[in-house]
Structures are given as structure tokens and as C-alpha cells.
Amino acid sequence: MNTSFTRKSHTFLPKLFFRKMSSSGAKEKPELQFPFLQDEDTVATLHECKTLFILRGLPGSGKSTLARLILEKYHDGTKMVSADAYKIIPGSRADFSEAYKRLDEDLAGYCRRDIRVLVLDDTNHERERLDQLFEMADQYQYQVVLVEPKTAWRLDCAQLKEKNQWQLSADDLKKLKPGLEKDFLPLYFGWFLTKKSSETLRKAGQVFLEELGNHKAFKKELRHFISGDEPKEKLELVSYFGKRPPGVLHCTTKFCDYGKAAGAEEYAQQEVVKRSYGKAFKLSISALFVTPKTAGAQVVLTDQELQLWPSDLDKPSASEGLPPGSRAHVTLGCAADVQPVQTGLDLLDILQQVKGGSQGEAVGELPRGKLYSLGKGRWMLSLTKKMEVKAIFTGYYGKGKPVPIHGSRKGGAMQICTII
């Protein structure tokens, strides 16, 4: 017997019955096993983030059930925007351009209010539509979690014909199916820090840059940061590393380029990646480092976190002889014309030198730990006490290009920033 509840079947059931069914059923049904529903650490961590859950799937596949469960789990501070409420029939967006305009205005309104958990319930089968949503997430600094039903019939058009509330035919459903058959891969996967953890780490990085810039040992090495034509008395490192990530910080695991990068699909298909998607983790920061090109934080991965670290990242010669996961880092800033990928390479360069027996010269103590000069304008602050930061494992789906970053409650554009 089919125990799923479509809009048609649960309309006449008491709300109390549905609430009882959904909360208990979520623990038992395999199709409802998602970390953001089952794992209490993840639920608590998501309350500290701004997350846009984008549901994808054919009509009748179980999206609305998932949407209601997310609303129920997160209570206050949660809003759902459903295409159904705008009388949008799944199919061509061109037929409902005005309805989608109203939907997007309402969604953006919730973003401006800093609603912690937003749920968008629609088929979301078109790449162009998803790109619009990802751009909005960038503008309002929301992390994205794509959610697709795990029901056995999610791609079975014959069954979905009977389940969907719009009475779409099997042929109608088949037209929507191609955009939903393959996993939608991000620009990259990674751990995305909560807002509080991002602010804490960003502040620690800024303080380090200020302390380093004022340190007498650093002032003697300014030639690595300033050309010969410039004055060499002092350098404002916070301004020097002006290319900084807006919003939440992150630690990249796998660069996917939306599925075009080597090994991207294989990585995304790993059971541990699927199981961990949308789950909370606690990352450990052991050191802060600066080179003439980048500023970053070294991340020490646990055995559990290393399962999400792609093996191909440890193949380049820069990683040779180093433990798996040595490249794990959070980019705090880049110098002009430097790409964020350089941060990990700079860290590997430092670690190779340390492995070779040259930890550098200890030049003093800072409030958070011991400062080392490694030559060539490279500096590392070894933290006396490791920093623990909370993060969600998910993907970044935007374009990674400059976008107008909107203020939240005050509204309006604040600045143009690049997602890095």
C-alpha cells in the first residue's frame, strides 16, 4: 500500500494527524533520510546559517512532503515559497512569467529579512532557472542545498501520472524528466562555515594581519610585498589582501566545474559524499599563514572529514610526501590579480619546507600563538589553541563572478564582491 501523501490525499486529514505522521515517519522511511532532518547537530548548526533549500523533482515525486518536513523541523525563522501557491503548472516558465516574477519578489523579500531557512518548492528542472536562483543566493549570501526526493517512483512517469495534482500526462512528465535525471553538480563542494564561525575566523585573520604588519621582523621583509618604487616603511596587510570572500567562508574539497572537471561525477557519486551532503561538521584551524599572494587558515581534517577529501588533490608534486588532506584550508584573502586556488598551493609550499626540516625562524609570540618567518615573505602563526569552526558540507553553485551583494534588512546594494 502506498503511504505517501500527495496534496490530493492529505487535504482532508486533520493537521494534527499529519504532523504526527510526518515527524515519526521521517525517522523510519529511507526516502526521508536527510542529515538536515535527522541529525540534531546539523539542525542546530543550520539555525546559525542562512540556507536556501531548493527542491527539485517531477510533480508527485515527494517534494512537497519534504518541504513540509523542513518547515516542521525548523519552526520559527523558516519560510516556504511554493510554485503551487502561484498557480504555476510545471512545464514552460514562459507561460507563467508574471507568476514567477511575483514568486521571485517574495523570495527576495524573505532574503532581505535574513530568514534563516528558506524552502523553495518547484520542479526546478531548467538550468537557466537554477542559475537565477543561485545568483539570488549569492546576492543575499545564502548557502544552497539542493534537495531531490528519494522516493522509488521519483522518475517513474507512469506512477507520477497518478500521483501529481496537476493531472499531467505521462508524456507531459517525460518532457520535464531530462533535466532531472542526472545529479546537478556545483562549481565546487566544500564545508561552508556558519555566519558566527565565519565572523570569528575572519576577525582572527584580520587581527593577525594587523599584528603582522606592525611586527618589526615583518617590516624588514617588506620587499617581498612592495615593489622598489614604493615606500617601504609600513604595509597595511588588510588592504593588501583586498580580494576577500564575502559572506560565509569555506574550505573547498572538490572542484567540479558543474561536472566538467576530471573526476567530478565520480566524486559526487561516492556514498560518503551523498550521505554527508547538507550535514554539519566541526573543522579545526591549527594555523594562520600569509604569503605575498595569499592569506589563509590551515585546516586539520579528522578521519571522518578525510573521507570527503578527494584523492586526486594529493597527486600534484606539491603534495608529494605530505599526509592526505594537507592542502585543506580556508582562504581569507588574496592579493590583486591572484586566484583563490593559489592559497592551497602556498600552504603546501610551506608544509613541504617544514617537512624538509626547516620550520623557519621563530620571531616572537603573538596573543594567539608563535609567529614563524619561513623566508620569501612567508609567515605562519602556529595557534596555541586550535580554533573550532562549525560548517555545513554542501556545494557552491553560482558563477564565482562579481555580484552585487545586497544588504539584508536595510536593503539596497552594498558593494560588488567576488565569490572566492
Curated annotation (Swiss-Prot):
Annotated membrane topology: Lipid-anchor
S-farnesyl cysteine lipid sites: 417
Any one biological process term the GO annotation gives: oligodendrocyte differentiation
InterPro entries noted in UniProt: CNPase, CNPase_cat, Cyclic_Pdiesterase, P-loop_NTPase
SUPFAM superfamilies noted in UniProt: LigT-like, P-loop containing nucleoside triphosphate hydrolases
Gene Ontology MF annotations: 2',3'-cyclic-nucleotide 3'-phosphodiesterase activity; RNA binding
Modified residue annotations for Phosphotyrosine: 110
Catalysed transformations (reactions): a nucleoside 2',3'-cyclic phosphate + H2O = a nucleoside 2'-phosphate + H(+)
Name of the protein in its database record: 2',3'-cyclic-nucleotide 3'-phosphodiesterase
Phosphoserine modification, residue list: 9, 169, 227, 239, 358
Subunit structure: Exists as monomers and homodimers.
Coiled-coil region(s): none
Active site: 250, 329
